[in-house]
Amino acid sequence: AALSGAFAARQAAGLLRPAAVGAGSAKAVRLDVRGDAISWIEVSDEGPAGEFLSGLNDLRLHGNRELMLGLTTLEMHFARFAPGRGYARHHDVSPQGADRVISLIYYLNRHWRAGDGGELELETDDGPVLIEPRADTLVAFLSARFYHTVLPAVRERQSVTGWFHRGAG
């Protein structure tokens, strides 16, 4: 609930900006491809957002120590999809390089119901898996391995989304 409050505060302050696709001179807002508005979470952020980032950083360090994952950094942002918006099929390897290793999505949507839409469609070897964006659900998957789509929802869809990196980050 505290993280949802931090999201609401950023939204009320007008800090969520339309997300772009592409890189360099090809970078552009393309609502037909990606329909979310985002606000980056920084290590220096205080309150629930900073605490959430700190907790995931602790998980990164534990994974490195116990599983030798070699994860170097973490980046996260709040994401808001307005009703009817989604994100076309893609994988999370950055155009700048393949340093994204694990993708993370933490959902903030209270009282989500079947029929609200907004599912994450994750493509697996056994076929697509639909994951409803219900509050307090954390989804993690290999960034370069799994193509995925955010299906349009009939109501606002909120999450914290990010990546563990290997390399420069």
Model-derived segments and spans:
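Fe(II)/2-oxoglutarate oxygenase catalytic core
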Residues: 1-103, 107-138, 144-169
